[in-house]
């Protein structure tokens, strides 16, 4: 990105440092940048370790998508006969693939090579020490470069005791005019990346998950039971632990004692429409108001692009936000979690900026941080939501009995959750109580109007009356144990939080049917708890742990967010019932949609830019002309009817799996009432064609300026 290599001594010009109401402002080096991702730029490398020569071929490695965490995998190729160099192919892990050290050593031995595992591991570590790079985009490259030029010119003019002639000053004025023209021109390249970053994104690969009871006694249920892909769905139920090995298909239709067409024992088994694409429209037609019938939306996307694309549709619809962002610790978690403080602040600030438009006026946000970043997070949250809207700092005391002693400091047994209102005056807060270990006796009191004070209630004998109390108001220190490694609730995600913790947050800040958002969904705990508490929910997450299953940081198969939510709907599985299920009497049921969003890297790969002459406009300075006016970008998906003066969009030319109905819903900022093969109908009655969508609505998706 375009920005200063070394932090400047002066303060930035984008905001005043001193104002009438603020004398402390948080500054960080990358504040003017959009954070894209952190990645290593691996290049092919010759290495010599303990006298053994290695060559690592990284030519086929592609950059990661956004900020997902992926392991590097090595495969032995050959021994070069001329000098004995061991050649390895290097790639990012796909579908849980790992480096098999024993197999590599055997293959090297077969190829007449000599090597031990210690030397091999050393060589791998040397290769992986290649530079890690943070990728950014400057939000306003023109303003930044002009500022830097002004500072350079000022320092040049006033350094030392120089006396400037009129001719020299004229030269400097000419230099400034030329520099500004060059800046106007080159900043357009960075600005184009900003436009791609912020452009609305296509919805792709969408499916619905709903429990069998939602289909009732409809004809769709019969079609489902005879569908050729039903065995694949049954295998998924088995993999998620919802049914046993002895389950047979006929058990689904076996009538129970009440004579229902669906056996009650299996009424909450979840159907994923990815197996039944030919029945999807038939299923959706069963709902009079589709989006209103959904319990939630699960979005596979980098969080900023997800929030940016969803901002219009979910504007002022979120009652409560809980996020558990990367803590900036550098530990080996299931996502990248090792940032410089400036990078971490940019990662979080760009997303927080979008949340204010999503929250209702009565809404709240809870940000979960630990010791490595909470001091920065508090100031950042004050900047975005205002110090006057700070409500509390909740201390989650999770006491770990395995915490080591004698480490030169007090054992660390808590984390902070910062609680802010969008608007303190209008905020809705619902106090909670917590049970006491032992009943407590409290004096019964009343307000004595005559004496204008509180008095104790006394019986006829003049004795003070006591009431037995079994619970007390919940304060800001929450004593909730951390999930143990053997807990049924734990899905294999390292930073997973207990449902009991999230339950307190949701109950204190929302009512049933109101919506909860988590845009760092992680293991899906927020979404799971929201479903069990009968709230609507919206979750955003990127990476392989989005799916039914994934390979975690320990190299083990683990349940992903999608799989966990399916178990929640079923009310049973490898991990369910667990958490708050018993106390909430949760047995299952539900309906949600999941999909992925087109990502920044997808657009970079698909957009077409040509090395051509600039478009000549006789009425405009060429330095200010839009450099990319001639470029197709993604217009190869559009067919122009010159006679009819119309543009026809063909989504299949871009991606094979675009969900046009959801894409249009996000573009229009409207909830879907009904979807047919020909059109999508919104809740306000507007209909939009799916066979020939409105060009003006589609245009920003394929051509931006």
Label every model-predicted segment.
Residues 1-290, 295, 311-319, 352-356, ...:
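Accessory, often C-terminal, charged low-complexity segments
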Residues 299, 366-367, 519, 539:
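Conserved SAM-binding loop
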Residues 305, 327, 373, 521, ...:
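Short, glycine/acidic-enriched loop or turn micro-motifs at the edges of active sites
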Residues 313-331, 381, 516-530:
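Conserved proline-anchored active-site loop of SAM-dependent methyltransferases
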Residues 319, 325-347, 351, 362, ...:
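Mobile active-site "lid"/loop adjacent to the S-adenosyl-L-methionine
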Residues 332-337, 404, 487-491:
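Short acidic, glycine/proline-rich loop/turn micro-motifs
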Residues 488-501:
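Conserved SAM-binding loop and adjacent beta-strand
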């Amino acid at each position: 990105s375009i920005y200063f290599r070394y932090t400047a001594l002066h303060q930035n010009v984008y905001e005043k440092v001193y104002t009438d109401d603020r004398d402390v402002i948080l500054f960080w080096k990358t504040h003017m940048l959009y954070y894209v991702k952190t990645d290593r730029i691996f290049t092919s490398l010759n290495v010599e370790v303990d006298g053994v020569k290695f060559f690592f071929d990284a030519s086929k490695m592609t950059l990661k998508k956004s900020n997902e965490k992926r392991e590097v995998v090595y495969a032995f190729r050959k021994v070069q006969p001329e000098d004995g160099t061991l050649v390895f192919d290097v790639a990012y892990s796909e579908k849980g693939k790992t480096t098999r050290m024993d197999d590599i050593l055997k293959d090297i031995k077969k190829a007449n090579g000599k090597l031990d595992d210690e030397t091999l591991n050393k060589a791998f570590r040397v290769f992986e020490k290649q530079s890690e790079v943070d990728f950014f985009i400057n939000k306003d490259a023109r303003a930044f470069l002009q500022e830097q030029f002004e500072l350079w010119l000022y320092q040049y003019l006033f350094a030392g005791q120089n006396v400037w002639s009129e001719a020299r000053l004229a030269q400097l004025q000419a230099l400034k005019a030329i520099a500004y023209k060059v800046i106007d021109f080159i900043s357009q390249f960075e600005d184009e990346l900003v436009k791609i970053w912020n452009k609305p994104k296509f919805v792709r690969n969408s499916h619905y998950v709903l429990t069998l009871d939602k289909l009732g006694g409809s004809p769709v249920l019969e079609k489902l039971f005879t569908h050729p892909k039903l065995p694949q769905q049954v295998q998924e139920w088995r993999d998620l632990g919802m049914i046993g090995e002895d389950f047979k298909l006929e058990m689904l239709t076996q009538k129970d004692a009440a004579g229902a067409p669906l056996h009650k024992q299996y009424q909450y088994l979840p159907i994923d429409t990815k197996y039944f694409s030919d029945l999807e429209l038939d299923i959706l037609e069963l709902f009079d108001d589709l989006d209103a019938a959904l319990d939630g939306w699960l979005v596979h996307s980098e969080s900023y692009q997800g929030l940016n694309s969803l901002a219009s549709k979910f504007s002022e619809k979120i009652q409560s936000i809980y996020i558990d962002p990367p803590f900036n610790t550098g530990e080996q978690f299931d996502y990248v979690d090792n940032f410089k403080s400036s990078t971490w602040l940019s990662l979080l600030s760009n997303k927080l900026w979008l949340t204010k438009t999503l929250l209702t006026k009565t809404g709240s946000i809870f940000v979960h941080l630990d010791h490595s970043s909470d001091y920065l997070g508090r100031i950042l949250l004050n900047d975005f939501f205002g110090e006057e809207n700070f409500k509390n700092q909740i201390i989650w005391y999770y006491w770990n009995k395995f915490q080591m002693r004698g480490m030169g400091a007090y054992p660390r047994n808590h984390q902070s959750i910062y609680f802010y209102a969008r608007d303190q005056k209008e905020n809705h807060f619902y106090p909670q109580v917590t049970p006491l270990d032992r009943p407590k006796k409290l004096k019964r009191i009343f307000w004595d109007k005559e004496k204008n004070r509180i008095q104790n209630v006394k019986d006829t004998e003049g004795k003070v009356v006591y009431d037995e109390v079994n619970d007390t108001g919940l304060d800001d220190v929450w004593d909730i144990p951390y999930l143990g490694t053997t807990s049924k609730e734990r899905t294999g995600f390292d930073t997973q939080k207990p449902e009991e913790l999230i339950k307190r947050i949701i109950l204190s800040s929302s009512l049933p049917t109101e919506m909860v958002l988590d845009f760092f969904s992680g293991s899906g705990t927020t979404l799971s708890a929201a479903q069990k508490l009968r709230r609507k929910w919206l979750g955003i997450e990127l990476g392989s742990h989005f799916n039914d299953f994934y390979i975690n940081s320990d190299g083990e198969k683990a349940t992903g967010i999608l799989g966990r939510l399916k178990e929640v709907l079923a009310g049973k599985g490898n991990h369910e019932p667990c958490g708050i299920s018993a106390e909430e009497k949760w047995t299952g049921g539900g309906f949600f949609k999941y999909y992925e969003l087109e990502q920044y890297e997808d657009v970079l790969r698909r957009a077409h830019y040509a090395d051509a002459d600039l478009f000549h406009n006789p009425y405009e300075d060429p330095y200010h002309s839009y450099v990319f006016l001639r470029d197709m970008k993604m217009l190869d998906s559009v067919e122009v009817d010159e006679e009819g003066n119309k543009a026809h969009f063909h989504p299949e030319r871009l991606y094979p799996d675009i969900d046009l109905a959801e894409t249009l819903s996000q573009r229009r900022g409207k909830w879907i009432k009904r979807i047919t093969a020909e059109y999508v109908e919104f809740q306000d009655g507007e209909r939009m064609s799916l066979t020939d969508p409105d060009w003006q609505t589609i245009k920003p998706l394929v051509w931006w300026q």
